[in-house]
């Protein structure tokens, strides 16, 4: 977005906020669900990776930071390689991702209280999409990842996680 477009958007938002009748202000971005905050561990026995193989260990830690969430993903692969991916994000905007060469940005979209989608991109091109669903009992989470490859097999992973702590450093 260019400077002129950015200024126009800021002016439009400021105008809408000051001219809306009291009690009818523009809606704030959706808040991140409390269900997400905590530590989640890969349940490899329930997970499926196509074409595979997936990581042998993975822990996802989600921490609330103001209105945003900090996501920390730590993985160990069968060949011993380790990966640590980090991002701070909220809904409806693109945020930078660190720790992987596969994608450099994430855009989150809230579907409902327990479901959200993420578009992962690299250099402005979509790398893949992930749909995260937290179970109603808040004890498990499923992430379905899809990526269409132009040169090789497409990717379709259904990955299950068990909540192991409500907050980092605390048992469930």
Where are these regions (language model features)?
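N-terminal secretory signal peptides that target proteins for export/translocation
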Residues: 1-3
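Juxtamembrane cytosolic interface motif at the C-terminal end of transmembrane helices
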Residues: 18-22
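Bacterial N-terminal signal peptides
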Residues: 8-17
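Hydrophobic small-molecule pocket/channel-lining residues, especially in calycin-type beta-barrels
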Residues: 23-172
